């Protein structure tokens, strides 16, 4: 089984990417540079309990993230059709990106070996990155536990 790459380092440039999004347009990290911070959250799968709770948590506080000057962007390996259903059903006001070949997940070090019902598989380990307006990693939340996570990220963005 392939080995996972390491997480990026706080203070270093975030790996750039361009991925298809639920807007119908491609989204790249560089389009936010100089304009907004980015909350880039990687999650395993649309419509699973933890992923739904996390997405809805970001949805519920999205106006506060916007007020803090941050864009929320979700990434998983699900296909566009699944993302669109998930976004519509839960009224998510932010884009979901399709990382079908896991290249971006690997670049961010979140594509990991997992044990699913006794079967070894590769998948996304729930992780959130805060990327500042200069395109550098400002904070990393690895192995995210959903409960309280969204509030923790917002607190980081709004602390003095």
What function would you assign to each model-found segment?
Residues 1-160:
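Chalcogenol-based redox active-site neighborhoods
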């Amino acid at each position: 089984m392939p080995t996972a790459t390491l997480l990026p380092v706080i203070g270093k440039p975030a790996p750039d990417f361009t991925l298809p999004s639920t807007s119908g347009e491609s989204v790249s990290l560089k389009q936010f540079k100089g304009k907004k911070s980015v909350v880039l959250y990687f999650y395993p799968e649309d419509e699973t309990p933890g992923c739904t709770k996390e997405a809805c948590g970001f949805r519920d506080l999205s106006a506060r993230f916007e007020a803090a000057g941050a864009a929320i962007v979700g990434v998983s390996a699900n296909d566009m059709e699944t993302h669109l259903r998930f976004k519509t059903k839960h009224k998510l006001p932010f884009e979901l990106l399709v990382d079908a070949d896991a290249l971006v997940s690997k670049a961010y070090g979140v594509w990991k070996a997992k044990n699913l019902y006794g079967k070894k598989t590769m998948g996304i380990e729930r992780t959130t990155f805060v990327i500042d307006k200069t395109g550098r990693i400002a904070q990393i939340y690895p192995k995210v536990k959903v409960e309280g996570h969204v509030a923790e990220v917002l607190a980081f963005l709004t602390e003095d």
